[in-house]
Amino acid sequence: FARRFSTLDHLTGGRIAWNIVTGYLDSGARGMGLDANRAHDERYEAAEEFLAATYQLWEGSWEDGAVRRDRAARIFTDPSRIHPVRHDGRHYKVDGIHLAEPSPQRTPLLYQAGTSKRGRAFAARHAEAIFLNGQTRPILARAVRDIRDAAKEFGRDP
């Protein structure tokens, strides 16, 4: 997954984005190899873990300067600047290097649309853009304020 997004980011010149959806349909879960969908909070737990692993691949596997592209010396990379990622979690395992060189953004622009308390916390921690709905301006303003406050709690500058 991380490699696909890195590849797309290269192909688009750094314009790829990811709308992170935890899913709610059993059919979607079966498409991911599960018998049934996870419970609501467990879906966010799995999403947190998935992002932790992909962040490590995007941001921690290849140091700046690892790609040399020295044709004369026939050296593409400096292997001492490429590191394996080891993630052994409850839902996912990763053991190896990121299989694509760093892309223009390294980490794509992240969108999220969670409306539950857990979903908004997830969005506040990770997303650069959040889909919101609200019947009135005051309702929407309150949601924006709550998410901005939560983002600050995660050390982010909304």
Please annotate each region the language model reported.
Residues F1-R4, A143:
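Residues at alpha-helix caps and immediate loop-helix transition turns in enzyme cores, especially N-
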